[in-house]
Amino acid sequence: MAPRWDSLYPYYMSLDMHPDGDFSSCAVRLSMALHHADAFSKSGYRRAGNKVSSHGWAMGAEQLYRWLRLHQLGAAQQLPVDGTDPSQYPSQNGIVYLRDCFVRTSDRSTDARTGDHIDLFVAGQGLLSAIRWPVEFPGGPFAIIGTCRDGKVRFWPAS
């Protein structure tokens, strides 16, 4: 069942950029918002063998994406990869997962992106993290979507 936007969005907006002090802050933030919207169980996530933060929140965008797909939300829609045209993207709010969209410090080159990101998507505006913390997302709230090197951009609409 899709999480309610009116529960996800305000809670997410109240969070700090690094709410649990963990490196994988996008997964931590989203799992906190999903928990607030009754769409995430810390104990169920941990029992499934997923990596969790010191406070039991999801760590790692790809693990959270897989868990949501298998246990919570079902299959997600595939979105276009070009991050330059906002009209290509859904006209509704939801959750977006981006695979291999940024360079980690351990990557050997800028062409070898292995960093994933999971976030709330605001219809007509882009990634919520990029709207809230623009210095972390140069190029604007749609630009990072266009950097996904294998076209793995997935979307679940919120209710």
Placement of each model-derived feature along the sequence:
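N-terminal capping segments
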Residues: 1-55
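...with weaker cross-activation on analogous glycine-rich loops/strands in unrelated enzymes
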Residues: 48-131
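Extracellular cell-wall/glycan-interacting regions and their flexible linkers
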Residues: 26, 59-62, 156-159
